[in-house]
Amino acid sequence: MDKVKALIKAHKLIIFSKTTCPYCISVKDLFKKLKVVPFVVELDLESDGSELQSAAGQISGVRTVPQVFINEKFIGGCDATTKLHSQGKLIPLLQEAGFL
């Protein structure tokens, strides 16, 4: 859990993801379209990926991926992140974090 907390603290925008997950790909594509480069942890490529996913899940309350954190706050997975964007609420969060 300490490693995940340290990663979340060190990166203003971090996504816990898996390379083959379509929802993960969608949320990464959204940030790409916004010209924002998140720090991405591909859990399926990490030797301790299962432990990292469990720890991230304890912090977020969600076990599934993707898990998106902005400024150390869990904002949700793909659906929640996409919804925030469609409501005009994602851009201000990214601006606050210094991305736009």
UniProtKB/Swiss-Prot annotation:
Gene3D superfamilies: Glutaredoxin. Disulfide bonds join 21-24. InterPro entries: GLR_AS, Glutaredoxin, Glutaredoxin_euk/vir, Glutaredoxin_subgr, Thioredoxin-like_sf. The keyword Repeat does not apply. Residues 1-100 form the Glutaredoxin domain. One of its GO terms (biological process) is response to oxidative stress. The keyword Transport applies. Its main location: cytoplasm. It is found in: Cytoplasm. Keywords: Cytoplasm, Disulfide bond, Electron transport, Redox-active center, Transport. GO terms for molecular function: glutathione binding; glutathione disulfide oxidoreductase activity; glutathione transferase activity; NADP binding. Has a glutathione-disulfide oxidoreductase activity in the presence of NADPH and glutathione reductase. Reduces low molecular weight disulfides and proteins. Affects the culmination and cell fate decision by modulating the levels of reduced glutathione. Belongs to the glutaredoxin family. This is Glutaredoxin. It comes from Dictyostelium discoideum.
